[in-house]
């Protein structure tokens, strides 16, 4: 697998470069792992920080059959961009207006009787039949119809089908252990899901597709594929089970900036607010023009590393709102103002990765890639740079 060298876009101070070729590679791999089941690529939260429209197009080009988002507004943004593929939205607060979704052909995920009632109001107002997926709670105790309320939900669905108000497209649930494919709770959830699918059939509600698998299960539990899988983080090349390595996935995002300033300081001089770092010898510093307002976590001060000219350099001192400092070491500096600094990327050239940041922060790489903002401009490399 070949990845072309990274270079900063001219005129851009800092950027999150998204390699659409990596997205396509990852989705092709997920399609292979799905073993005949369809793939719904999840592009919620603006494509996990990668850009929902661009990543959706890349995922569809690579073989994804459908798209998944959290909110109706996210689905409508895809429609506004000209994406006509099936889109499912499943997170709805009280009082939501489902009419624009119905008019745009967006599929609606339902987790309660209240949501169904509000949807049926929109059906009457628009004259459009709603295509629905019922989300059931199999143990996460978050979004989804609880088992105790499921029988009455099925009764209401059956009545709505008889009135030609809805088409029952799918049954879905969400897994508790996103990064532990062997956890026995996964099997408990799968059995509950299977039972609820059978219960629907017994009550005369027949769903066209059922889907439970997240990224982890798609990559490692083919027995949980049902009719469709619903990967999220793996679409973007981040391993759903970091302990198992990259699993053949290629991280799509690289965050980088220009070196704004290079300067020398003497031994004993200190850096940034609070002087938390003091030079032990004469050294050179590079100033990078991004900070915590741009998604560079303040808690990484004095802990992160940055790759400049093929070498990792330690960050020193506190990270500020819009800048931080790295130590280039003594002697004649081998870094010049205007050089490229890579904060994290795929790691193929030795640069830090999103997983490295997650490990330092005690969090997950999902949080890292959804954090770049502010003055970090999102840019794209077209889908011809990664080869399977």
Swiss-Prot record:
Keywords for the protein's UniProt record, in alphabetical order: Isomerase, Pyridoxal phosphate
EC number: 5.1.1.1
The keyword Lyase belongs to this UniProt entry's keyword annotation: no
Pathway membership, UniProt: Amino-acid biosynthesis; D-alanine biosynthesis; D-alanine from L-alanine: step 1/1
Positions contributing to substrate binding: 142, 321
GO molecular function, one term: pyridoxal phosphate binding
Active-site residues annotated for this sequence: 44 (proton acceptor), 273 (proton acceptor)
Cofactor(s) the protein needs: pyridoxal 5'-phosphate
InterPro entries: Ala_racemase, Ala_racemase/Decarboxylase_C, Ala_racemase_C, Ala_racemase_N, Ala_racemase_pyridoxalP-BS, PLP-binding_barrel
Domain of life: Bacteria
CDD domains listed in its UniProt record: PLPDE_III_AR
One Gene Ontology term, aspect cellular component: cytosol
Catalytic reactions of this protein: L-alanine = D-alanine
Modified residues (N6-(pyridoxal phosphate)lysine): 44
Pfam hit, one: Ala_racemase_C
Function: Catalyzes the interconversion of L-alanine and D-alanine. May also act on other amino acids.
NCBIfam families on file: alr
Entry's family note: Belongs to the alanine racemase family.
PANTHER family cross-referenced by the UniProt entry: ALANINE RACEMASE (PTHR30511), ALANINE RACEMASE, CATABOLIC-RELATED (PTHR30511:SF0)
Protein name: Alanine racemase
